[in-house]
Each structure stands twice: as structure tokens, then as C-alpha cells.
Amino acid sequence: MPRPIQAVIHGPALANNLQIARRHAPNSRVWAVVKANAYGHGIERVYEGLRQTDGFGLLDLDEAVRLRQLGWQGPVLLLEGFFKPEDLAIVEQYRLTTTVHCEEQLRMLELARLKGPTSVQLKINTGMSRLGFAPAAYRAAWERARAISGVGTIVHMTHFSDADGPRGIEHQLAAFERATQGLPGEASLSNSAATLWHPKAHRDWVRPGVIMYGASPTGVAADIDGTGLMPAMSLKSELIAIQDLQPGATIGYGSRFTVEHPMRIGVVACGYADGYPRHAPGWDGNHTPVLVDGVRTHIVGRVSMDMITVDLAGVPEARVGTPVTLWGEGLPIDDVAQASGTVGYELMCALAPRVPVLVEPVGTAEAGDLGKAA
């Protein structure tokens, strides 16, 4: 028998989350962002759940080709564009939309002699200060892009740095408006946070990422309460051993947790080699949450490579084989991430290849029914 750990990708949740994004931006088209192998969920695994999107946004040419091989005929956006001149042959072959964010990319386009209309999203740096033309240089870049014979539609694009925080988007929105004033073309500005909370920035296209997977842009699960978003991934396992410990016993490497009263603990088949955060605390009053048989408890001691230990005080009926949820249905991934000093994005992307993954089909009536292996 294999280890009992598995991840479940919830197709119905993905489809639900796409509809939530549409309800928040009803007059916009949606780029469902599937970069980083769909935030660790797997492009092939999320495709059915997200295929009602208007387009997919991603980074790698390989990921774009995989989408085409799955049968996707709609728009595919390269969020960082192309990296070498030879990439443009693939852009044309697979009818990809490319971001253009710097002088070097613009020059490669001018020299490429593109055959057919290639759609471009021209990026403005309005304050994120990673990618994009400076606002003062944007109009000239747009004029050059428009003059390239193989360039088709040009969409104005930027990315918000503080849509999930108190500074907000006003300063960047104003810079965007100044840079694009009088220029024709559609606009794409909104990430997940702006899609949820800044309707004035929705424009023609929104680009939701982490909310597609049911997590919060702020990293705080409570901030998306009431939205209807659902977790797209559950990491599940079982208890593989139980220990009854007396005061003075210590738990795990480094003996970080010392038992102060008679205590029953469970050993879970999950560790940092599975993608669980090694730095998740389980001592000194700082405890990372976990569900045992649906009851919220917490880890005790250090996370090991293959195991974690959990407090069973609130689960007296627990035994070997009792189900455990590390995150997902009933336990927001953001709660685990926040306790561990990181964000849900990182935990999603860190799911280890050795963890078996099951896909719950989109048509499944009840969450938790397992579908095909993937």
C-alpha cells in the first residue's frame, strides 16, 4: 500500500471561482492565470475546471504549448513575454499573445519580420517597478509597436503593487491614465485583489490568479469570507501512529516541544518532503492548525521530512487511519501559511512531485468525491 497522503484538485471549486471572478467584474473578460504550473495545481488538472475562461495567462512557452495540446483554441497570454528572438517562431506557431515590457523585446519584434498579426500587451511600469516601460516612454513605445507590420492588436497593460493593501491603486491608476491618454486600444490592469475590490480598474480584461485557487490575495483567509471562493486543492493524509506521552517527554527533532501533562499525540504521514512547510511552528504557544477527523487541532514539535505530530486532545476517538486535512476543505491554506510565516501561494507551488494527486471532476455533485488520477 502507498503512503496515505494525497492532494485532491477540486474541479467544481475551480469552476466556481471563475464564476466568482466574473460576478465581480461582469463587464470584463477574464485571463485565468495558470503560471507556475497553475500555482502548483497542474495545468492539465485545472484545465477542465477553468476552460470557460476567456483566456489563460502564464509564463512559459512550454506551458502555452501544453494548453494548445489540451485543445484550448482561445487566447493565451505570455505574462513576461518572450526571452529570445527564436521564441517568436513559437509565439506565431501557437497563436500566442505576448507581453512586451522593455526596449529589448520591442527591438526583437522590430527585427523579427512577423508573418501574421501577433497580439501584444504593452506594459507600463506605473509603480510596481519590475517590468514595463516608464510612463514617459510609453507613448513612443506604443507608436513603435503599432508600426511593426506583424503586430496586431495592442492592449495597454500594467500591474498593481498594493491592490490588496491600504495604499490601494489610485496612484498607479492615475499614472496609467496619463500614459495612455488618447491612445486607442483595450486595457488590462486588475490582478486578483483588484478584481475583488477595485471595480474602477476592471476595464476590458482582468487577470485573477490566486483567487482562481480559492486563496486570499492578502494571505488572510478572513479577507475573502463571503465571496464564495472555494479551495481548489486539499492536502490530505491519515494518522499512521499514536503515542500516549507523560510529562517530561519531548517530541521531534531538537526536542522543541516538552510535554507538560499526560498527552495523546498522532503521527501524520506528511512532512516537508511532501511540500509541507518545515518552519511551521509547533512549540512555545505557536501552533500550526490541522484537521483530524474534521476537528481543528494543531501540530506539536518540529516538522520532519516525512511526518508531523499533532495534538489529539480534542479528538479522543482518533486512531490509526483517521483522516487528516493539512489544508483545503475546512482549513484554509492561508491559515496554515500565516502560522508558518509565509503565504498560501508558496504552499500551493511547493506541493512535492511525490504526492499522488486526484482530480475531482467538474461535474461531481458533492465535494470530496474523488475522480480520475492525474
From Swiss-Prot:
The keyword Oxidoreductase does not apply. InterPro entries: Ala_racemase (IPR000821), Ala_racemase/Decarboxylase_C (IPR009006), Ala_racemase_C (IPR011079), Ala_racemase_N (IPR001608), Ala_racemase_pyridoxalP-BS (IPR020622), PLP-binding_barrel (IPR029066). Its cofactor is pyridoxal 5'-phosphate. The active site is at residues 35, 253. One of its GO terms (cellular component) is cytosol. Substrate binds at residues 130, 305. SUPFAM superfamilies: Alanine racemase C-terminal domain-like, PLP-binding barrel. GO terms for biological process: D-alanine biosynthetic process. Keywords: Isomerase, Pyridoxal phosphate. The keyword DNA repair does not apply. It catalyses: L-alanine = D-alanine. The modification N6-(pyridoxal phosphate)lysine is found at residue 35. Its EC number is 5.1.1.1. It is an enzyme of class 5 (isomerase). Pathway: Amino-acid biosynthesis; D-alanine biosynthesis; D-alanine from L-alanine: step 1/1. Catalyzes the interconversion of L-alanine and D-alanine. May also act on other amino acids. HAMAP family: Ala_racemase. This is Alanine racemase. The lineage of its organism: Bacteria, Pseudomonadati, Pseudomonadota, Betaproteobacteria, Burkholderiales.
